[in-house]
């Protein structure tokens, strides 16, 4: 896969593409895209017997403060094939930090042309409370049994903050080229 050939989206940050690395409900394995080789590699086996609460990946042509493309958790119920590209709408961001530093997670839903299921979801607060608790619980605990690793959740921010973080990550990626 040539990641550089994949568009950031039709109308960023309102509408962005995500390259999926880990499917919802998949085995407790963390995959990451090798950005230079364009191939999916096993990053690590999760020590906790937990599965991702959504499809997980990144927005191409972005760069977060942690040096990786911006992370996205897609709220949907169908597992996507790792390596595929899906068009999404950002609806919020979970603010968190781990042993490597700031590591925010953009929360998104599939774009309306893919499904009408999320038409009324414009902000993370439109999701069921249990969905938000499951996302928080997963990220608070998925590294629990890994020596020297930790995670702290600082709360949630709205869709406008998610879009601002995406804009900043796009600009950061442009200046790093």
From Swiss-Prot:
Cofactor(s) needed: Mg(2+)
Gene Ontology BP terms: phosphate-containing compound metabolic process
Keyword Hydrolase applies: yes
Organism of origin: Rhizobium meliloti (strain 1021)
Complexes and interactors: Homohexamer.
CDD domains xrefs: pyrophosphatase
Protein name: Inorganic pyrophosphatase
Keyword Metal-binding annotated: yes
Top EC group: hydrolase
Keywords: Cytoplasm, Hydrolase, Magnesium, Metal-binding
Reaction catalysis annotation: diphosphate + H2O = 2 phosphate + H(+)
Cellular component GO terms, alphabetical: cytoplasm
Gene name, Swiss-Prot/TrEMBL: ppa
UniProt-annotated binding residues for Mg(2+) 2: 71
Family stated for the protein in its record: Belongs to the PPase family.
E.C. numbers: 3.6.1.1
Residue numbers binding substrate: 30, 44, 56, 142
Major site of localization recorded for this protein: cytoplasm
UniProt: Mg(2+) 1 binding residues: 66, 71, 103
Pfam family, one: Pyrophosphatase
HAMAP family xrefs: Inorganic_PPase
PANTHER family: INORGANIC PYROPHOSPHATASE (PTHR10286)
Function: Catalyzes the hydrolysis of inorganic pyrophosphate (PPi) forming two phosphate ions.
């Amino acid at each position: 896969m040539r990641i550089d050939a994949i568009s950031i989206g039709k109308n960023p940050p309102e509408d962005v593409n995500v390259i999926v690395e880990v499917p919802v409900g998949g085995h407790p394995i963390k995959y990451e895209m090798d950005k230079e080789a364009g191939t999916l590699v096993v990053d690590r086996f999760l020590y906790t017997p937990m599965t991702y609460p959504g499809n997980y990946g990144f927005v191409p042509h972005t760069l977060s403060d942690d040096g990786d493309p911006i992370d996205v958790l897609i709220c949907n119920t169908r597992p996507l094939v790792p390596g595929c590209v899906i068009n999404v709408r950002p609806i919020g961001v979970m603010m968190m930090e781990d042993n490597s530093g700031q590591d925010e997670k953009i929360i998104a839903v599939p774009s309306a042309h893919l499904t009408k299921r999320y038409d009324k979801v414009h902000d993370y607060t439109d999701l069921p409370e249990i969905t938000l608790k499951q996302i928080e619980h997963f990220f608070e605990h998925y590294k629990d049994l890994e020596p020297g690793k930790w995670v702290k959740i600082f709360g949630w921010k709205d869709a406008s903050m998610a879009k601002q973080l995406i804009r900043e990550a796009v600009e950061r990626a442009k200046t790093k080229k």
